[in-house]
């Protein structure tokens, strides 16, 4: 397929069919998401769409398929009622909501999720709509948005174990898939990482370096991933004869990692190894260690988690446990589109395996 296959005017289905060497009907089925087309033919058609520059008429397609060709990508927060702050009194301000949004955009993890979702949707003529659902009102808006057909389904990245949004969507009969296992039993598909195995890799690496006074900066313990990483780390340390390991809880931010590292150094000045439950906190830990004159990794070895851009920006570059976020986000999207094509299919889960990436910090 070459550029000379482009039409002089706007590319048509016939142009795509000619470029792909298939029938117009086959092209139509692929573009409209019909499942009974051989995957190899689907890929040929998608390449032909790219080469010809064909753009489906969304309005006409929507009339036929009753689809919006859009997916809501929802970052959902804690189950805090509108009118109540984190302590259960007072009111949530615009600043509270702004800080939630700012934290989302500051974390490289969320950018990687968006990349994985967009890369999967774009070749299929679909696009994501980013939404935030950190309050009751915002969650109601997400449900209403889906009910009115503005998006075909939802991809949910939940930041709190008590998040009620997955339950609200399943009760409403709306298609949704989660990034990470739900904290409560909900009949909903999800993708996740074997977090405990990842923490085991981190602990074993520190022990293999002859670190013996090892501490951990955990993630927030109201988040399943934070709980699982801490459990995996503790279990591994206990199996190797270290039943007690100092813990300082963080919030998956660089600032919280810095504060946690300060607390650990004050209480355990002789520590020689640190496992931070994400890379931002690992970066914060390295910064504080340098300020206290501790060399990384000669005096204190540090291992992070995620293999995000923060790991490369860290000084020295951070040894970390890789979470294949882009691949996980793409699989989450595939599960949602499969659910849309087969509404009665049962909920399922896909668990990815972590990998240790060794760099300069440990």
Q: Which residues fall in each region the model found?
A:
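Structural motif corresponding to alpha-helix initiation and N-cap regions
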Residues: 10, 56-57, 139-140, 162-163, ...
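Bacterial carbohydrate/catabolite-sensing allosteric modules
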Residues: 2-6, 19, 51, 116-124, ...
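Generic structural signal for helix capping and beta-alpha/helix-loop junctions
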Residues: 34, 66, 81, 138, ...
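N-terminal helix-turn-helix DNA-binding module of bacterial transcription factors
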Residues: 1-70, 362
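Short gly/ser/thr-rich secondary-structure transition/capping motifs
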Residues: 51-57, 135-139, 286
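Alpha-helical recognition/docking segments in bacterial nutrient-uptake
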Residues: 5, 70-204
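Short acidic/polar active-site loop segments enriched in Thr and Asp
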Residues: 23, 69, 127, 152, ...
């Amino acid at each position: 397929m070459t550029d000379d296959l482009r039409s002089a005017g706007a590319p048509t289905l016939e142009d795509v069919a000619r470029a792909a060497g298939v029938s117009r009907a086959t092209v139509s089925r692929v573009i409209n998401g019909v499942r009974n087309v051989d995957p190899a033919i689907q890929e040929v058609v998608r390449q032909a769409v790219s080469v010809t520059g064909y753009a489906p008429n969304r309005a006409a397609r929507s009339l036929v398929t009753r689809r919006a060709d859009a997916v809501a990508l929802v970052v959902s927060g804690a189950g805090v009622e509108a009118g109540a702050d984190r302590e259960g009194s007072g009111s949530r301000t615009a600043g509270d909501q702004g800080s939630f949004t700012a934290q989302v955009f500051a974390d490289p993890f969320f950018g990687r999720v968006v990349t994985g979702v967009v890369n999967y949707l774009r070749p299929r003529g679909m696009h994501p709509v980013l939404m935030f659902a950190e309050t009751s009102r915002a969650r109601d808006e997400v449900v209403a948005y889906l009910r009115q057909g503005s998006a075909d389904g939802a991809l949910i990245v939940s930041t709190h174990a008590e998040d009620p949004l997955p339950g609200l969507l399943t009760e409403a009969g709306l298609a949704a898939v989660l990034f990470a296992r739900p904290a409560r039993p909900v009949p909903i598909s999800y993708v996740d990482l074997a977090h405990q195995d990842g923490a085991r890799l981190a602990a074993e690496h520190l022990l293999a370096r002859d670190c013996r006074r090892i501490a951990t900066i955990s993630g927030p313990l109201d988040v399943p991933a934070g709980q699982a990483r801490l459990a995996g780390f503790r279990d591994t340390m206990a199996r190797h004869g270290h039943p007690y390991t100092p813990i300082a809880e963080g919030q998956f931010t660089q600032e919280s990692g810095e504060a946690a590292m300060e607390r650990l150094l004050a209480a355990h000045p002789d520590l020689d190894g640190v496992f931070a439950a994400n890379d931002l906190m690992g970066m914060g830990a390295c910064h504080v260690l340098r300020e206290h004159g501790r060399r990384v990794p000669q005096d204190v070895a540090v291992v992070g988690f995620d293999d995000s851009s923060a790991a490369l920006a860290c000084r020295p570059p951070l040894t970390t446990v890789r979470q294949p976020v882009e691949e996980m986000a793409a699989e989450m999207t595939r599960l949602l589109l499969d659910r849309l094509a087969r509404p009665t299919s049962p909920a399922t889960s896909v668990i990815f395996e972590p990998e240790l990436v060794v760099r300069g910090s440990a």
